Amino acid sequence: MKKYTEMTPQERQAEYAAVKAKFEQLKDMGLSLNMARGKPSKVQLDLVTPIFGLLTKPEDFVSDGIDVRNYGEVAGIPAARRLFADILGCKPEQVFVGGNASLQLMYDAVSKAFTHGLAHSEKPWCKLDKVKWICPVPGYDRHFKVTESFGVEMIAVPMTAEGPDMDKVEELIKDPTVKGMWNVPKYSNPEGVVYSAETVRRLAAMKPAAPDFMLMWDNAYCIHEFDCDFVEFPDIIDLCAQYGNADMVYEFASTSKVTFPGAGVGVMASSEANIAYFTKLINIQTIGFDKINQLRHVLFLKDRAHTLELMKQHAAILAPKFHAVLDALDQEIAPLGIADYKRPVGGYFISVDTMPGCAKRTLALCKEAGVTMTGAGATFPYGKDPQDSNIRIAPSLPPVAELEQAIAVFCTCLKLAALEKLGA
């Protein structure tokens, strides 16, 4: 098959007629498929169901002499802090264990910077005229929603194969109103990029003009390989301390895609000084998070080695789904020259870049044919993709058979949108 751009107008018209007919056939199937969010499938959730049988007798609820059924331990039970320190490669004293969502802790961290200021703030951010934030793109839509909700001016910085464009980042942080930066350093959402060692070093070594700059390190996929062995990653907290930036980084992780998205455990890791500061503030809003759930996770996951064994089981379920999507893109899209895409080996997403001006149209056609996907523009601040080209595919939820149907629809819609753009 020729690339669409190399076809004659007559060839494109013939191709358009064939693709349009295929699209109408797919519409007539009455499909209702969803690839919108990176949800674990039922089969993955079933792997973890035995966690609910671990606490049955009264004595089971005691950990390190603490009865987890009672009040207290705002920063998390010691056993949970040890577990997540082991997984993240930091110290237990640097870990705060919260409720089921790391996103809540991210929101809380930004919120407290606005209401109270951080340890090195001259004043709470709500009293500042302007707050700006660095946003690597394409990125995670919910990160952008957090900063947008506080009226922050978000500055897009392009991602490269090594991570964010560090030359641009290092220039931006010279502005004292630039107060933070979002990061998903391992298997980034949505591209699956792993930050290089040099990028991580440059981030840790930054000297921002703002004394209270927040390096937000969302390590959501720290153990989420599906097509390779576990990849060790630098301890950003220790690295920042080595460069004199001990209080700059705030690391986040959760078990949302290890155990249950709706009943997992979210954590924040940072310097001991930051953990003490946030514990003091959070102690006003809660007397403690769900310590019973924290203990369940300690007993079920045990340590990093056992957790990685569980992640291999998740990987065995996920890998065929990613392969199904990538195989379809290889066969149906790559030869036509109408999109580029990444081949992740970890994380939960596949990122596709269409020809400029085709993402919204592709997704509108998908919806018409019964396939729901992440909205166009979601991977950019304010939901505005300047090229209207990036699409995030989430293969994890549907069974492989449904996924193959959904990706067939996607490929057909992408072809149709590209042909329309080329004037077929």
Residue ranges, per PLM feature:
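Short amphipathic alpha-helices in soluble, non-transmembrane regions
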Residues: 362-368, 406-411
